[in-house]
Amino acid sequence: LNKKNELFKNIFFYTETDFQKQQIKKNTAIDVEMFSNNLTFSKKEIPDKKFTIGILGESRFDKGFYKLPDLIRNLNSKAIDKVQFIVQINNSPKNLLGIKNEIYALSREFKNIEIIDGYISFFEYRKLLEKINIIPLLHELDQLKNCGSGIVFASMVNEIPIVIPKDALYVKKLFEFESFVEAKDLNDYSKNIIHIIENFSFFLELAKKQSLSYKNKLNFDPLNNRI
């Protein structure tokens, strides 16, 4: 029994979200600690020419993949001289094949869309984030009720302003500085992306402050110090 108790002293439990923390505490009476996502940091500057809009991750319905063609058309109709796109298409289900084909057709029409089809390594992911200036988080609101998204943390550590769904309250709580804008629909996404472009130095300064704040948080994270 003493050996068992000694072993448990050296086992630590962590969770990534407050919702998970509260559920574990409710069902087990264990008060676990929170662990912050640990990613690679990079610096951003104001681009010389076009602003790169980045959409990375899995191409699922609940992550808003179906919204992409309309967003691209909308933005290109208003600011084609100011924007270009990096779009990753990954794990797209069969019922969204039409959306995938539509994005390829748009890339042939507009010439300002770079498509990365399939899985990318972490190194490739980091390199793409270094190129991206603005991220639209197109997820369905239900997906963001009790947890964030790796893309949100990626925006923080890479000093990237982000447009998030309106009323994504959990995501908003992750930010100390308002390097994000909320959008209620696709027209709002386009309008706010253009708003960020036209005020980029302001949003970039906030993104840099947010990145530093998150870096400091990681430096004091107890799990980081144990690894």
Identify the function of each model-found stretch:
Residues 7, 98-126, 134:
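Nucleotide-activated donor-binding/catalytic signature segment of Leloir-type glycosyltransferases, i.e.
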Residues 45-73, 85-87:
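Conserved donor-binding/catalytic core segment of Leloir-type glycosyltransferases
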Residues 133, 159-161, 166:
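A short alpha->beta transition loop at the rim of the catalytic pocket in nucleotide-sugar-dependent
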Residues 184-194, 198-227:
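A charged, aromatic-enriched C-terminal amphipathic alpha-helix characteristic of glycosyltransferases
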Residues 18-20, 29-44, 91-92:
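Short beta-strand->alpha-helix junction loop in the catalytic core
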Residues 137-153, 165-167, 171-172:
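Nucleotide-sugar-dependent
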Residues 2-32:
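A short, active-site helix/loop in glycosyltransferases that binds the activated sugar's phosphate group
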Residues 84-100, 118:
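Glycosyltransferase donor-sugar binding loop
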